[in-house]
Amino acid sequence: MAKLTKRARLIREKVEVTKNYDINEAVALLKELATAKFVESVDVAVNLGVDPRKSDQNVRGATVLPHGTGREVRVAVFTQGANAEAATAAGAELVGMDELAAQVKAGEMNFDVVIASPDAMRVVGQLGQILGPRGLMPNPKTGTVTPNVAEAVKNAKAGQVRYRNDKNGIIHTTIGKVDFETAQLKENLEALLAALKKAKPAAAKGVFLKKVSISTTMGAGVAVDQSTLEDVK
């Protein structure tokens, strides 16, 4: 049997896999176990009470976390005219139409989020095979296809996270960095779960937020007792 690393041994000793932890205790555990030489992200996995095989039960959207994600986000915007000026003023790194599409086709994709005004979708639509597999294709449900591109840029810069359940009905996203204050991570998690509750499909029955686990980039998941969170019980 392969030898456990020092970190893996520590996780095995400290984390009770069957326990739901108070949110403050869960965050304290993550901080204690975050021994990587870089500032790890704090990620969340939310098991939803949906049948992902049914299109009317899939959950997709976006929300701005009150304390952001701790990441510097580079934004590309497909738009023109006054919208292009507004996007640039809002902080977008790349703004354009056909010339920006040419950069993408050439493999120059130095950005984390793509936003498009509706009139630009004729251009963006040609890039689906490039942007789609990378999770970068703009979509109205996540607020990345919008006539108000400036607001979308500001949201992306402010720490907006996008979410979409996978084939197992689980949402995976980030809620900050391990060096955030415990209260900041708690409030970010609460904001995400509140957004998910609002996005609950009408066809979904029974318990919607079935399980919530948080982890660091290199760490194991710690299940959170939802009763220790505000307004998401």
Curated annotation (Swiss-Prot):
Family annotation (SUPFAM superfamilies): Ribosomal protein L1
Gene3D superfamilies the UniProt entry points to: 3.30.190.20, 3.40.50.790
GO molecular function: rRNA binding; structural constituent of ribosome; tRNA binding
A Pfam family of this chain: Ribosomal_L1
Classification via CDD domains: Ribosomal_L1
Biological process terms in GO annotation: regulation of translation; translation
Gene Ontology cellular-component terms listed: cytosolic large ribosomal subunit
InterPro entries: Ribosom_uL1_bac-type, Ribosomal_uL1, Ribosomal_uL1-like, Ribosomal_uL1/biogenesis, Ribosomal_uL1_3-a/b-sand, Ribosomal_uL1_CS
Keywords for the protein's UniProt record, in alphabetical order: Repressor, Ribonucleoprotein, Ribosomal protein, RNA-binding, rRNA-binding, Translation regulation, tRNA-binding
Subunit structure: Part of the 50S ribosomal subunit.
UniProt-listed NCBIfam families: rplA_bact (TIGR01169)
Role played: Binds directly to 23S rRNA. The L1 stalk is quite mobile in the ribosome, and is involved in E site tRNA release. Protein L1 is also a translational repressor protein, it controls the translation of the L11 operon by binding to its mRNA.
Recorded family membership: Belongs to the universal ribosomal protein uL1 family.
Protein name (Swiss-Prot/TrEMBL): Large ribosomal subunit protein uL1
Encoding gene (name): rplA
